[in-house]
């Protein structure tokens, strides 16, 4: 399955990396958080870890560690604008439920 990225999300990641002036990609991971247990984490990557998996689409690298991949396999990362708000949207087929505020999820 892997990780997929929409073209809009890829354009946004490229813009962030260009503005930053360095980096080989964006790390997508999970951490323990919120009332449902897990939350998504996005951070810039300058150096790969030996166990990282790299998913490339539209010229953008999404980097995932093996522990997070268990929860993220099959996810699509999108970038959406809804009214005055804009940001990354996670379309994760593994999510069984998420908290009311949308901060965390459970698989």
Curated annotation (Swiss-Prot):
Its cofactor is Fe cation. Binds 2 iron ions per dimer. The dimer may bind additional iron ions. GO terms for cellular component: cytoplasm; cytosol. It holds the Pfam family Fe-S_biosyn. Fe cation binds at residues 35, 99, 101. InterPro entries: Fe-S_cluster_asmbl/transfer, FeS_biogenesis, FeS_cluster_insertion, FeS_cluster_insertion_CS, HesB-like_dom_sf, IscA_proteobacteria. Is able to transfer iron-sulfur clusters to apo-ferredoxin. Multiple cycles of [2Fe2S] cluster formation and transfer are observed, suggesting that IscA acts catalytically. Recruits intracellular free iron so as to provide iron for the assembly of transient iron-sulfur cluster in IscU in the presence of IscS, L-cysteine and the thioredoxin reductase system. This is Iron-binding protein IscA.
């Amino acid at each position: 399955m892997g990780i997929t990225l929409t073209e809009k999300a890829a354009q946004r990641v490229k813009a962030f990396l260009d503005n930053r002036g360095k980096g080989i990609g964006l790390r997508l991971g999970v951490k323990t958080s919120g009332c449902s247990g897990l939350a998504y984490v996005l951070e810039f990557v300058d150096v790969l870890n030996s166990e990282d998996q790299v998913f490339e689409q539209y010229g953008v690298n999404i980097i995932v560690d093996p522990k997070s991949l268990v929860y993220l396999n099959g996810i699509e990362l999108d970038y959406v604008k809804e009214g005055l708000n804009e940001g990354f949207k996670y379309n994760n087929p593994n999510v069984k439920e998420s908290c009311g505020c949308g901060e965390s999820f459970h698989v």
